Amino acid sequence: MSIAKNPVLSGFYPDPSICRVGEDYYMVNSSFAYFPGIPVFHSRDLAHWEQIGNALDREEQLPLSGSEISRGIFAPTIRYHEGTYYIITTNVDHGGNFVITAQDPKGPWSVPHYLGDAAEGIDPSLFFDEDGKCYYVGTRPNPSGVRHNGDWEIWIEELDLHAMCLKGAGTAVWKGALKDCIWPEGPHLYKKDGWYYLMIAEGGTGPEHSISIARSRSLREWFCGCKRNPIFTHRNLGRDYPVIYAGHGDLVDDADGNWYVVMLASRPCEGHCSIGRETFLAKVEWEDGWPVINPGIGHLTEKTELPIGEYRLEREVTHADFIAFDQKKIDDRLLSLQRRDENAYSLIERKGFLRMHLKKQKLTEKTDAQYFGLRQKDYDFTFSACMEFDAERENEQAGIVCYQNHANHLSMRICGGKEKRKLQVIAHITENDTLLAEEEINAKGMLELYLKAAGQRAEFFVRDEEGKVLKPVSYTHLTLPTILR
């Protein structure tokens, strides 16, 4: 018996997709315009996870130049077939839908095989039928004309894995459960007991988000929806419920025939979901040929008992992240913006340190500014970074930041100066700077920049080399215009 604590992946881990190979489970998530892209996770009990790499970890795989932070890589699907792992996903501004492959989920993963204009839409998925054929399951705008925002449909076409192209124009199979529903997306196809099951998200990633399902005896026929659709949603629980926006699920079974679903949801704080969409887990039972998610409960729970033996991992994902720069490569958990300039940092110039060279690009621009970031996993947290920064020019800056996008972030930075350095706290909101606090710094050498957050409020501190806490710099509200990251 193992106990999964929800969310099983805390913080910015949206659009989960999962597959099982023997006793091992592998899961991936969207990464948008961050580099590297598509984190890959491994588990043996669905409760404890470790990150084993990033599928898109080379610049040749991941063109993101100029992308908004919420664009980039959307909704990957991971599948396994005859010794090969497949991930299909969308780079919304650079090439569209593509497939990458690997013999080991740790990588290396191949360069993208772009599927071209024929594979339109977003959130593609792959399905391997019993005869070995591979099918592309996608979304696209209503070909008869889009009547309203989100008027899309789900379609299927066979995929030639050797040529990496679709074999035909595709067959529309469903438009979602509700009449005139918006954004039928995130499709996943399964086969069970002679039926093909198509599970999708609909309602948009917001208060109306949900999971719906349909089935058919043939892939080329219209799918009939479950009469209980949507089969899962939190839309009826109200905006103040601790977990909202539940949807976009992917099913998986265990070796004993038990079923589960992973999905995204968000935990709001003071009306904002500023840590993004997270990955949750629920149990599934089949009744009358249809899946029932968390039967007898009907909503996501804080803990889920699983009929799988507990299996602990050496590098389990936890709520506490500690990064020591004593390795030869950057930690898989660290993210950069759009790309990572290998000449702009070093782990060997000073042993035990990450040396970050100054760049002209700014965090206020949609560029690859100098940035290494960790996902925020909770609303109550502390974060600190030890830093040496002895620049003398006034336009040279370094520090820490709570980053949501180029237009909205909160930073504490050391600014260079000919005589004395300054420490500033700046709120950059809707592309405008507000100086919240400014202090002169007399201390030299190593400084520890320290942030303590509680809910949507944060207090900043600075410690010198002797551990002395300098004057608190600012106490401020963290709530910025919310985007669903």
Predicted regions: what they are:
Residues 348-364:
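Short carbohydrate-recognition loop motifs
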